[in-house]
Curated annotation (Swiss-Prot):
Pathway where it operates: Pyrimidine metabolism; UMP biosynthesis via de novo pathway; (S)-dihydroorotate from bicarbonate: step 3/3
Binding site for Zn(2+) 2: 99, 136, 174
Keyword check for Hydrolase: yes
Catalytic activity: (S)-dihydroorotate + H2O = N-carbamoyl-L-aspartate + H(+)
Classification via Gene3D superfamilies: Metal-dependent hydrolases (3.20.20.140)
Family to which the UniProt record says this protein belongs: Belongs to the metallo-dependent hydrolases superfamily. DHOase family. Class II DHOase subfamily.
UniProt name for this protein: Dihydroorotase
InterPro entries in the record: Amidohydro-rel (IPR006680), DHOdimr (IPR004721), Dihydroorotase_CS (IPR002195), Metal_Hydrolase (IPR032466)
Top-rank taxon, per record: Bacteria
Enzyme type, top EC level: hydrolase
One of the record's GO cellular component terms: cytosol
Function: Catalyzes the reversible cyclization of carbamoyl aspartate to dihydroorotate.
Length: 345
């Protein structure tokens, strides 16, 4: 049996939701991951440091006994966000980053930014104090094709923002295109990118071929195969600017399996198994630790975890549940469409 020992991983982009869903999903992350950047797009969103402190307490209360897990809190950027509150939250260590959602870009993003100029006082303060900005990198203007949203965002929003505030540390979250990968590679400095598990595995065919597959629908939407290959190359390269952010996003089945289904794929259950498969397929198992456990902490100015986990490759496929039960209902687990042989021991 093949074994791989790596430092305990972190998840640099995670949705935990709240209430019954939070209590149902938190263990799937805390079992294997030491830390996670927790997204603030609740209803209502986490917009102040006080909101973040209260949400953090709800997360801590939901962690299964015996698990050691640290939620890293973020604030939801609005056009009315108070720079002083942001600085105070960051200075206290409570808040690790601010999240920019263009209004309407994804789940619970209607409170997001419509005019980035109105958020400039906060962004200028963040640049001064070295606080990271996590960006959902898509435009939402109706004339832009959904498959082009990321490339247009880079050209019309991200690049001008970086020119105006070159000291602002920006995480381009859930990169989905070759355009995004190339932009990060070509622009040294305060820029890095997270990559999801599922975007390394599926392209847009998974959603559309043979019928609509709602459990492969996410935002940013999966793209063409050439983009998936670019993401794989970046993830397995060892480049310190790329790291894991699963964007694991639980929705109960009725919210996915309907006429207007929610965007999000739930990967927390089997992410490490999927990633071991991908990195083995690419001949890069020796660089899995960098992607999951080293590059992210380095970017966020945190020490790498001292604890380790062991991944073992079995002779027979590992069985994962197709769904998990929560107080709010069933949530479908990501199916990578191939058998998984690696599992955390």
């Amino acid at each position: 049996m093949q074994e791989l020992v790596i430092r305990r991983p972190d998840d640099w982009h995670l949705h935990l939701r709240d209430g019954g869903v939070l209590r149902g999903v938190i263990g799937d992350t805390s079992r294997h991951f030491a830390r996670a950047i927790v997204m603030p797009n609740l209803v209502p969103p986490v917009v102040t440091s006080a909101d973040a402190a209260a949400y953090r307490q709800r997360i801590l209360a939901a962690i299964p006994a015996g698990d050691r897990f640290e939620p890293l809190m973020t604030l939801y950027l609005t056009e009315g966000t108070d720079p002083d509150d942001v600085e105070a939250g960051y200075g206290s260590g409570l808040v690790k980053a601010v999240k920019l959602y263009p209004a309407g870009a994804t789940t619970n993003s209607h409170s997001g930014v419509r005019d980035i100029a109105k958020a400039m006082p906060v962004l200028e303060r963040m640049a001064e104090i070295g606080m990271p900005l996590c960006v959902h990198g898509e435009v939402t203007t109706p004339e832009v094709d959904i498959f082009d949203r990321e490339a247009v965002f880079i050209e019309t929003v991200l690049d001008p923002l970086r020119r105006r505030l070159p000291d602002l540390r920006i995480t381009m979250e859930h990169v989905t295109t070759k355009d995004g990968v190339d932009y990060i590679k070509e622009h040294a400095g305060n820029l890095a990118g997270s990559i999801t598990t599922h975007h390394l595995i599926i392209n847009r065919n998974a959603i559309l071929v043979g019928g609509i597959k709602p459990h492969y629908y996410c935002l940013p939407v999966a793209k063409r195969e050439r983009h998936r290959q670019a993401l794989r190359a970046a993830a397995v390269s060892g480049d310190v600017r790329f790291f894991l952010g699963t964007d694991s996003a639980p929705h109960v089945d009725p919210l996915k399996e309907c006429a207007c289904g929610c965007a999000g794929i739930y990967t927390s259950v089997n992410t490490m198994s999927c990633l071991a498969h991908v990195f083995e397929e690419e001949g890069a198992l020796d660089r899995l630790e960098a992607f999951t456990s080293l590059n992210g902490p380095a970017w966020y100015g945190l020490p790498a975890n001292e604890e380790t986990i062991t991944l073992r490759k079995a002779n027979e496929p590992v069985r994962y549940p197709a769904k998990i039960e929560t107080e709010a209902g069933l949530i479908t687990v990501f199916d990578p469409l191939f058998p998984l042989y690696w599992a955390v021991a």
